[in-house]
């Protein structure tokens, strides 16, 4: 069975939003996957978009006055070498870890703030 990509795309262009929504749900059920990225993008436009978010990026916004401690914490969190960890800290704002669960993101934020860094979760 060969797929005709152009025919599939043409059929998708002609489908209504409701039909496309049903298709996405059927694909999610059939293959056990989630279209969470598209939901997160759509939800971000609404006021409750942050409440539905399930993965976060931990961003170092400022190293503060205890830069050496922050570099060590970044090194421990990321598993990077000392030079690379220093580069992340010196290049703030920089993302320390991407796509982590909310509880892990809050734990990492607490560790970094404990040594004097300023951190945001995105």
UniProtKB/Swiss-Prot annotation:
Homodimer. Part of the ribosomal stalk of the 50S ribosomal subunit. Forms a multimeric L10(L12)X complex, where L10 forms an elongated spine to which 2 to 4 L12 dimers bind in a sequential fashion. Binds GTP-bound translation factors. HAMAP family: Ribosomal_bL12. InterPro entries: Ribosomal_bL12, Ribosomal_bL12_C, Ribosomal_bL12_C/ClpS-like, Ribosomal_bL12_oligo, Ribosomal_bL12_oligo_N_sf. The gene is rplL. Keywords: Ribonucleoprotein, Ribosomal protein. One of its GO terms (molecular function) is structural constituent of ribosome. This is Large ribosomal subunit protein bL12. One of its GO terms (biological process) is translation. It comes from Ligilactobacillus salivarius (strain UCC118) (Lactobacillus salivarius). Belongs to the bacterial ribosomal protein bL12 family. The keyword Nucleus does not apply. One of its GO terms (cellular component) is cytosolic large ribosomal subunit. Pfam families: Ribosomal_L12, Ribosomal_L12_N. PANTHER family: 39S RIBOSOMAL PROTEIN L12, LARGE RIBOSOMAL SUBUNIT PROTEIN BL12M. The keyword Ribonucleoprotein applies. Forms part of the ribosomal stalk which helps the ribosome interact with GTP-bound translation factors. Is thus essential for accurate translation. The lineage of its organism: Bacteria, Bacillati, Bacillota, Bacilli, Lactobacillales.
